[in-house]
Amino acid sequence: MINSPAFLRLRFAFKLSTAIVLSLVLGFHLQLETPRWAALTAAIVAAGPAFVAGGDPFSGAIRHRGMLRVIGTFIGCIGALVIIISTVRAPALMLLLCCLWAGVCVWISSLVKVENAYVFALAGYTTLIIIVTSQSEPLRILQFAVERCSEIVLGIVCAILADLLFSPRSIKQEIDRAVEELLVGQYHLLQRCVNGISKEELDAVWNGLVRKTHAINGMRSVLMMESSRWQGASRRITTLLTQSWVMITQACETRLTLQDHPNAVKGAIAVMLEQPAETPADVQRRLRQLRHLAAAHSRSLPPTLVSWLGAAARYQLLAKGVKTNVRISQSEAVLLDADIPVKASSAETHHAMINGVRTTVATGLGCLFWLWTGWTSGSVCMVMLAVVTSLAMRLPNPLMAAKDFLIGTLVALPLGALMFMLVLPSTQQSLLLLCLSLGGVAFVIGIEVQKRRLGSLGALASTINILVLSNPMKFNLSQFLDNAIGQVIGCILALSVILLIRDNTREQTSRTLLNRFVFGAVSALSTRPAQRQENHLPALYQHLFLLLNLFPGEIGKYRLALSLIMMHQRLRTLVLPVSPTLSAFHRQMRATAEQVIGSTRDRSLHFSRLLAQMDEYQQLLRDHQVSDEAIDAVGRLTALLHRHQHALGD
């Protein structure tokens, strides 16, 4: 009953209503000039994570979002003060700098991690809000900035209190369940790779495992928002995910080995891998039996299968620690310290630049429209332009996000009119009636937000934004209509800019991602022990996950990326002699691979040079009397790059 979907939806709806009503009551009690901002902040902070999660958000999500909003607001206020002090004598230049500032903030938000992007997006449009709304009274800019920060902090505190009051859910149980299911999925992938599977079935299986592993990483971030007592579990999960990437890679490589040597896995191990195992307990029992058999027949087994079993053993050890959250043991500490993940740099630099240009152009057009028409509510249009372009650009589908805002503002027009003309005037003698009316509206919209109904989140924010909710309340019908229509026009302009300034960087992003895989394979060639310990798998699979999302259905790119990841893992285990000549050549190849990633016009030239260096490197290995296994592995990578030269270098 308590964990039923219906109960959770009702609980969040009560939580959202409580946050909005509490912020409004405290705003009036503290004599704030515009308690609307506190209510609007509480609504956005509480409803935003619920819309993303599609239900009641887990513990820590609202608190984390609130802290990001505080930081972004303070950055935006400081930016507004600096711009106004610097350009107080040139209002047109002031607005131009605001537009540029908003574009730069959106550009930065498109490059940083998704969970931190909200800070910079908010900083961009907060500066614009402060400057635009203070144009009539520029001498009150400092007072307005302080009041804005106070109202936002009040709204955030109310959202957090409401979240704590209605018992937020912990994501820990979901993580434990997902970790067990992931191990079962990994074992099924190994079974199918050993027993034979078509390419199409293999693509579907490893695609699902990549998404499940990435989802657990997202859950880990939410767990860290919940409490600091999960730091040990978070460290274990990070290394556990590395073992998951290793298992996916080694299982797929085992399949390739069996294609060349069909009898590489035989006897009792082959028979055991044919036996079904559906539950976590069955998989743990099978793995224990496989390790015993592998210990007795390790020399006759493919190295990739032995490596897979080792990764599975490490996975089980870490999964036990994640579930119990006990103090990190010595054996676990060795695993955690040995894992040195390489951070993945953004492959969407051009996409980020387009997002920044869209925001700058949209806000600039809004400024021109405002100055040209002299519209009294042009500031509302400007604010909506900045909000839509700042928040929509970081999402996978900015166009759909802009449509959501537009539908929300259209719904807010009749809903807000009903509240403004009938409900609010009838509640002027009773704060209780005012709270009940707004709480009822928030309750209904809160249920729709959890269903991710198109326009629900935009309707909630837009309705609160156009209502009076000031101290004292003033019912000016013409101003209400101006504000409501200004919101709609702002969303239409933002949608038009997104449609007109098209993002044609998808193909460039695709080649950048694929060449990142090439660089990962080349960087595995090293004679330095410290560099060989660097773990590129999390970064490579993060790029693969982005590739899956940006180019759904393009199987050829997925297979090429996975092949390069397998080459990276194979080359990383090669034993190369310590030689200044080899070390210098490794640095030269890495530099060329980096040039392939960064170049646009001369990519084909740099890629041809990399292929020539790979051919020369094989001869260099023969001169140093390196094992045939290492030379063959480098030859496979070279042949793979030659086969896909058009996709990687043109």
From Swiss-Prot:
Keyword Transmembrane: yes
GO biological process: carboxylic acid transport
Spans through the membrane: 12-32, 42-62, 66-86, 92-112, 114-134, 151-171, 368-388, 405-425, 429-449, 454-470, 481-501
GO cellular-component term (any): plasma membrane
Membrane topology per record: Multi-pass membrane protein
Location within or outside the cell: Cell inner membrane
Domain of life: Bacteria
Pfam families, sorted: FUSC
GO function terms (MF aspect): transmembrane transporter activity
Coiled coil region boundaries: none
Alphabetic keyword roster: Cell inner membrane, Cell membrane, Membrane, Transmembrane, Transmembrane helix, Transport
InterPro entries xrefs: PHBA_efflux_AaeB/fusaric-R (IPR006726), PHBA_efflux_pump_AaeB (IPR023706)
Biological role: Forms an efflux pump with AaeA. Could function as a metabolic relief valve, allowing to eliminate certain compounds when they accumulate to high levels in the cell.
Family: Belongs to the aromatic acid exporter ArAE (TC 2.A.85) family.
Family matches, as NCBIfam families: PRK10631.1
Name of the protein: p-hydroxybenzoic acid efflux pump subunit AaeB
Gene: aaeB
